[in-house]
Amino acid sequence: MSIAAVILAAGRGKRAGSLPKKPKQYRLLGQEPVICHTVRCFCQNPAITTIILVIHPEDRQICEQAIADFKEQLIIVEGGNTRQKSTLRGLQALRKFKPKYVHIHDGARPFVENKLLEQIHTTVTPQEGVLPVLAVCDTLKRINSTHHVLETIPRTHLYSAQTPQCFPFERILAAHEKAIKTCKKEFTDDSAIAEWFGISMRTIPGSPHNIKITWHEDLNTAHLYLQKKMQMFPDIRTGNGYDVHSFEEGNSLILCGIKIPFHKKLNGHSDADVALHALTDALLATRGAGDIGTHFPPSDPQWQNVSSEIFLRHALDIVKQAGGRIANVDITLIAEEPKIGPYRHAMVGNLMNMLTILPDRISIKATTNEKLGFIGRGEGIAAFATANVLYPGEIPK
C-alpha cells in the first residue's frame, strides 16, 4: 500500500505572535524547531514512502536549516497565499509518485503518535477517508457582535477535528482542483472539502496530546508536554568511545574541529581528529549503530583527508532521527603535548554549534600519561568520550 504525506508549513503564524522572520513552525520546542518534531513521526513510519513539505516562499533558507536532519526524506514545495492553495500544490507535487493514499497534516501539530498513523493506515479505504476527532467537552455558546450569549449549543455528537487526515489520493486531489476551479473558499480543513466533493469520512479517536500550536500559549503548553513526555519515558542511554592516533611530521593538528599549531600532525585516513572520532563512536553506541569504521571504512578513498565533522554529523543524524536529545558529552584527551588549555574554549564553542547544546553540557579535559607508554614517549594522542542521550519511549523490560 503506497502512502504519502503532505505537511503544511506555509503559514505565517500571526495568531501565535510570531517573531519577525520566525513563524511558529520554526520556533524552538525543546532543542529543535517545531517542524522537526512534526516531520519526525512521518519520516520514521516505514509505510509512508513520500513526504511533501509545503513552505512559504520566503522561508526556504530557515526551513532548510531547520529540517537539515531530514532533508533526504523530504521534498520541499512552495505554497500559495492560502492554506487551500498550499494543499493543492502539495498534492499536485505528489501526482508523479502515484500514491494510493495521502495524509494531509498541519505543520504546527508536533506530537503525532505513530499508533495514530497505524490506526489510520488500517482504517482508510479507496472509498473512505479517515479523520481523527476528539469529543467536545466544553459547553458551547453562540454569541452576538456585542459579546452577549444568544444560545447554548448542545454538544452531543460534536467533535473537534485533528490532523493528519488521510484520503484516497486521486479523489482528494480531484476535490481540491474542483474547489479551486469553482472558487470554493469557505473550507477550514481538508475533510470539509472531501465532504463537499462526496468523499465519505470515517472518524477515529484522536489524541489529546495532538495539539495544534495556534496561539502563543499553545507553545508554552507544548513545552510542558514535551518535558513531561521525556520524563515519563526516561530512556537514557550512555555511549563510550575511544580512539588513538600517532604523530607524524607536520605543522598542525585538529582536535574537536579546531586547528592547533604544532610541530607534528596526527596520522590518519581522515583529518585524524582523535576527539571527534571518539565522540562519534560514543554517539553511535547510544543507538547500537556500530562504530565509525562501520560507517566510514578507512579502506574507502572517499574519506581520505576529509573533516571528521562529517563523521560526527552523521552520528548526530542517527541520534536525532530516533528522537534523541543529547544530555551531555565528556571528552578526555591524553597527551604529553601540545597544551590543550589555550584551545579548550574554542573546542567547546565548536561542539556547541555542532551538537546544539549549552556549554555546561560539554566537558573537555586533558591529562598527560606521566611519561608512561607510547603516549608518555610523545608518540601520539588518545581520547576517551562519553555521551548521554535521552530518547523517547519506554525502557524494555
Swiss-Prot record:
Name of the molecule in the record: Bifunctional enzyme IspD/IspF
Function (record text): Bifunctional enzyme that catalyzes the formation of 4-diphosphocytidyl-2-C-methyl-D-erythritol from CTP and 2-C-methyl-D-erythritol 4-phosphate (MEP) (IspD), and catalyzes the conversion of 4-diphosphocytidyl-2-C-methyl-D-erythritol 2-phosphate (CDP-ME2P) to 2-C-methyl-D-erythritol 2,4-cyclodiphosphate (ME-CPP) with a corresponding release of cytidine 5-monophosphate (CMP) (IspF).
Organism: Bartonella henselae (strain ATCC 49882 / DSM 28221 / CCUG 30454 / Houston 1)
Cofactor(s) listed: a divalent metal cation
Keyword field: Isoprene biosynthesis, Lyase, Metal-binding, Multifunctional enzyme, Nucleotidyltransferase, Transferase
UniProt-annotated stretches for the region 2-C-methyl-D-erythritol 4-phosphate cytidylyltransferase: 1-236
Keyword Magnesium: no
GO MF terms, alphabetically ordered: 2-C-methyl-D-erythritol 2,4-cyclodiphosphate synthase activity; 2-C-methyl-D-erythritol 4-phosphate cytidylyltransferase activity; metal ion binding
A Pfam family that the UniProt record links to this protein: IspD
